[in-house]
């Protein structure tokens, strides 16, 4: 009969502590890139939708991650990460 392996990995941080630390890091990064009033409105929407629950914490983490990813991908002026617009040359053969 199979047995579950013993827990041999390193001690893990409890999920709720990890989630709150992640949320704090995301909030600190978000205020550098988005208007505070806009972020406050987002927080109010999450609170009105989920209340003071872990589901709300997970939702705002997910939304902030997506917003920051898209913001950096489009090309944040404060970051070296992102798409750099290039001029296309019309004289060469087209790629298809």
Swiss-Prot record:
Keywords assigned: Activator, AIDS, Apoptosis, Cell cycle, Host G2/M cell cycle arrest by virus, Host nucleus, Host-virus interaction, Ion channel, Ion transport, Modulation of host cell cycle by virus, Phosphoprotein, Transcription, Transcription regulation, Transport, Viral penetration into host nucleus, Virion, Virus entry into host cell
One cellular-component annotation, GO: host cell nucleus
Post-translational modification note: Phosphorylated on several residues by host. These phosphorylations regulate VPR activity for the nuclear import of the HIV-1 pre-integration complex.
GO biological process, one term: monoatomic ion transmembrane transport
Chain spans, region Homooligomerization: 1-42
Keyword Phosphoprotein on entry: yes
Cellular localization per UniProt: Virion; Host nucleus; Host extracellular space
Residue positions, PTM Phosphoserine: 79, 96
HAMAP family, sorted: HIV_VPR
Role: During virus replication, may deplete host UNG protein, and incude G2-M cell cycle arrest. Acts by targeting specific host proteins for degradation by the 26S proteasome, through association with the cellular CUL4A-DDB1 E3 ligase complex by direct interaction with host VPRPB/DCAF-1. Cell cycle arrest reportedly occurs within hours of infection and is not blocked by antiviral agents, suggesting that it is initiated by the VPR carried into the virion. Additionally, VPR induces apoptosis in a cell cycle dependent manner suggesting that these two effects are mechanistically linked. During virus entry, plays a role in the transport of the viral pre-integration (PIC) complex to the host nucleus. This function is crucial for viral infection of non-dividing macrophages. May act directly at the nuclear pore complex, by binding nucleoporins phenylalanine-glycine (FG)-repeat regions.
Note: HIV-1 lineages are divided in three main groups, M (for Major), O (for Outlier), and N (for New, or Non-M, Non-O). The vast majority of strains found worldwide belong to the group M. Group O seems to be endemic to and largely confined to Cameroon and neighboring countries in West Central Africa, where these viruses represent a small minority of HIV-1 strains. The group N is represented by a limited number of isolates from Cameroonian persons. The group M is further subdivided in 9 clades or subtypes (A to D, F to H, J and K).
Subunit field text: Homooligomer, may form homodimer. Interacts with p6-gag region of the Pr55 Gag precursor protein through a (Leu-X-X)4 motif near the C-terminus of the P6gag protein. Interacts with host UNG. May interact with host RAD23A/HHR23A. Interacts with host VPRBP/DCAF1, leading to hijack the CUL4A-RBX1-DDB1-DCAF1/VPRBP complex, mediating ubiquitination of host proteins such as TERT and ZGPAT and arrest of the cell cycle in G2 phase.
Family: Belongs to the HIV-1 VPR protein family.
Protein name per the record: Protein Vpr
Lineage: Viruses, Riboviria, Pararnavirae, Artverviricota, Revtraviricetes
